[in-house]
Amino acid sequence: MANKNVEVMRGNPETAVKKLAIPIMISMLLTASYNIIDGIWIAGLGQEAIAGIGFITPIFMILNGVSVGLGSGATSSISRFVGAKNHKKASQSAAHSLLIFLIASVVLTIVLLILQEPLLKLYGASGESLAQGIKYGTPLFLGLFAFIFANGASGILRGEGDMKRAMYAVVVSVILNAILDPICIYILGWGSAGAAIATILSSICSAIVILYWILVKKDTYVDVNLGEFKFDSSIAKDILKVGIPASMDMLVMAIAMSLYMIFISSIAGEFGIASFTSGQRLYLFAIMPLTAIGTAVTAVVGSSFGAKNGEYISRAHKFGAKFGIIFGTCVTLILVVFATQLSTIFAYTAETAHLVPEITRYLQIACLCLPLTGAGMASTFFYQGIGKGTISLFWTIIREVIFTVGATFFFGIYLGWGLIGIWAGLAIGRAAASILNYLYARYTIKGIRETLGN
């Protein structure tokens, strides 16, 4: 199985991006459903619970981003060694990735448990919403190791093109989460904390399944033997030169989201926060197919870069961008046309029904950026594929902080358009930055092809 996956990555780049993207897409949509499922069940707890957990969202984005980012570092490193046909280095990269996941889990758990309350207060949480946020966040952060290993180890499988088994582990996890959520929240009476506990238990199962394949069953392309492990700083650096910037991608987005929430809270208080975070759940769900395409681009570009094939690098990026635009357009149409119906998913009680019109407006305005975001996403992940994680981070900063935070402040605060201005700023900032990102990626690829001579 593993060798077939490797051959797909080394073959036709358009076919490879498409074949790899579909299972990643399913995995990511299922992973995003954690947030959706939690939101549906938590909606029954009232506006304070929705807002409180909404305040945790930026912090959750950071910890989830670290796990995905470190997984991206593993994917990039392993795929480049696979392209260069260096099996030993690919296996060493996988072993070093596991060590990095362990260290990150311990450090981040301690940091987030200490900082969660000050951060929630900074976002504007107080009273019951602050209590609900802490109640949800504490067990979530205690189980951080599960997220790190589940997402990180998936990155190892993706580095060798084994996307399907990464998807299977997620399927088990999501089904378990859907079963445990109502039990932990309502039957056991744990409320907000129950949603977090259900998510953590599900992630633990996902991590166990993937680590079993890699460490026990040993039927992967990479051959990890922890008993023979020897630390090699050059391999660790190769992983981290993509993994750290990729992790910081989500940190940057979390910082940007924190600023959006400060703007929104100053305009409309808990009502605005509840509307935004409910709509944001759907936006994050909708963007998963675009992220999946980008992740496939990382693996294929990494393999092509390792093989020094400039033509395949160019074709993989261009196809990924087109694929992303098509998916982004389809998703946008669904969100705009069915905005009202989708909004009621998170506001189905008498207490939260008044949120529906504003969630609807968010979906119909903020999500208009998705088609162009598809091209931008493929471009951001292209840089991870060639091992230039810092440039990938640079474009995330341009998109989320410079363009989008600037646009939301300009339209929402400076011009005084209120929440509609915030929603418009989200769409305009992200769309404009994505266009520039794509153009710069094409310029970079032109230089790579000239250097490689193909």
What do these predicted ranges mean?
Residues 1-21, 78-145, 187-243, 301-369, ...:
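Short alpha-helical transmembrane segments in multi-pass integral membrane proteins
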Residues 15-75, 79, 244-264:
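Signature of the first transmembrane helix
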Residues 19-35, 139, 150, 173, ...:
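Transmembrane helical elements of multi-pass membrane transporters/channels
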Residues 29, 33-51, 120-127, 183-190, ...:
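Helix-terminus/linker motif at the lipid-water interface of multi-pass membrane proteins
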Residues 47-58, 133, 137, 196, ...:
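Small-residue hotspots at the loop-to-helix junctions and early N-terminal turns
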Residues 50-110, 147-166, 261, 275-339, ...:
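Small-residue-rich hydrophobic transmembrane alpha-helices
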Residues 62-65, 109, 177-182, 207-211, ...:
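Hydrophobic transmembrane alpha-helices of multi-pass small-molecule transporters
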Residues 71, 140-158, 166-177, 195-210, ...:
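Short runs within selected transmembrane alpha-helices of multi-pass transporters and secretion channels
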